[in-house]
């Protein structure tokens, strides 16, 4: 089965690799690893760090090629100049899914171009690439927080945005209404080849989701997006 065809795959990970995991306070790698460990996610977490044999008490590896066995999902918080080699390693190891998380607004135009070139080169049937804001991915029902944000309370609203700030605002509104999150992802719309339509299709019909809130993505194919919306609203209420 190709990486592209595995609907819902991200929502049942048993083994997650975090490339760029760190203990350095306030770094992106430290914040995301801390949230993964404190949620707490019940599956296996494997850190990748160039300098340390252990990170947060977990056995760490210097690169993907040294990790034994398979993994469901790779998370990378390393800079764009690492992407080309990282994607090659993912394909060699047959790790079919990777999510890139960065504070994109702090990066230079050259770094954006480096990221864009590597993503365009490697995204395809062998490797599915999603590009996220620091708000990343949260699945409260599975105690999974792959983001720099605090844990969202569990509830029945699926949230898909293109900005970390929008995710925070909607989450605060939901909390004031006494509501929580079933699934959340915050994409980098300009860079992510895996679109909001793709993710909406992956949301599928899920007992944990009664309504979905989506921030419109004008950068993607609108026909595909509205087709995904039509299919989704056959079983679940949606708001944009």
Which stretches of residues belong to each language-model region?
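Catalytic-core regions of core metabolic enzymes
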Residues: 1-240
């Amino acid at each position: 089965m190709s990486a592209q065809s595995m609907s819902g795959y991200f929502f049942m990970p048993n083994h997650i690799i975090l490339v760029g995991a760190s203990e350095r306070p306030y770094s992106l790698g430290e914040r995301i690893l801390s949230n993964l460990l404190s949620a707490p996610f019940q599956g296996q977490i494997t850190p990748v760090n160039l300098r340390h044999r252990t990170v947060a008490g977990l056995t760490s590896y210097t690169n993907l090629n040294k990790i034994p066995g398979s993994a469901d999902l790779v998370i990378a918080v390393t800079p764009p100049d690492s992407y080309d080699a990282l994607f090659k390693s993912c394909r060699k190891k047959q790790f079919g899914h990777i999510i890139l998380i960065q504070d994109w607004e702090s990066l230079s135009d050259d770094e954006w171009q480096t990221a864009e070139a590597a993503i365009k080169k490697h995204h395809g049937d062998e490797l599915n690439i999603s590009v996220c804001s620091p708000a990343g991915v949260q699945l409260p029902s599975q105690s999974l927080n792959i983001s720099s944000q605090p844990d969202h309370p569990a509830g029945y609203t699926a949230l898909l945005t293109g900005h970390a700030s929008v995710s925070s605002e909607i989450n605060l509104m939901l909390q004031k209404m006494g509501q929580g999150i079933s699934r959340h992802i915050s994409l980098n719309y300009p860079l992510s080849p895996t679109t909001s339509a793709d993710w909406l299709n992956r949301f599928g019909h899920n007992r944990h989701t009664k309504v979905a809130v989506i921030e419109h993505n004008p950068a993607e194919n609108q026909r595909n997006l509205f087709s995904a919306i039509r299919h989704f609203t056959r079983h679940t209420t949606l708001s944009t």
